[in-house]
Amino acid sequence: MAEQFSMLRSELTELLLVAVGAVPGALLRWQLAHHLGDQNLLVNVLGAALLGLLAGRPVAPRRQLLVGIGFCGSLTTFSSWMLAAMKHVSAGDWPAALGLIGLTLGLGLGAAALGFSLGRRLRPPEQPRSEP
């Protein structure tokens, strides 16, 4: 019974971390859309850079849940990106659809790589191991 309670407590803590991280990510996305208009490209590239940064350095699992899954997951948008591409396809504008997909993939991959590289540079130096 105690083990089940401990497992449930751990899962609820993880769920709470994701939810707490998701709120500011969603609010930032909403504010960017409110002030700058449709900014799927901006939020997806920004989210990719931040995830790359997290991946490039040692991050505690709880921070990964809070920032990686919660914040970045709610900031970025795959479905809105695909809907924008589909609207171009529906209008018969395949070049615009493919351009949007290619641009987002290219910039997103570049941003993730840049974030990863920066994360590696910001990584704390490895501590020398003392041998017994």
Curated annotation (Swiss-Prot):
Entry's Gene Ontology cellular component terms: plasma membrane
Tagged with keyword Cell inner membrane: yes
Known regulation of activity: Na(+) is not transported, but it plays an essential structural role and its presence is essential for fluoride channel function.
Catalysis: reaction(s): fluoride(in) = fluoride(out)
Keywords: Cell inner membrane, Cell membrane, Ion channel, Ion transport, Membrane, Metal-binding, Sodium, Transmembrane, Transmembrane helix, Transport
Localization per record: Cell inner membrane
InterPro entries to which the protein is assigned, alphabetical: FluC
GO molecular-function term, one example from the UniProt record: metal ion binding
Residues involved in Na(+) binding: G73, T76
Membrane topology: Multi-pass membrane protein
Transmembrane segments: 12-32, 41-61, 65-85, 96-116
Any GO BP annotation: cellular detoxification of fluoride
Pfam families: CRCB (PF02537)
Family: Belongs to the fluoride channel Fluc/FEX (TC 1.A.43) family.
Protein's job: Fluoride-specific ion channel. Important for reducing fluoride concentration in the cell, thus reducing its toxicity.
HAMAP family reported for this sequence: FluC
Protein name per its UniProtKB record: Fluoride-specific ion channel FluC 2
Gene encoding the protein: fluC2
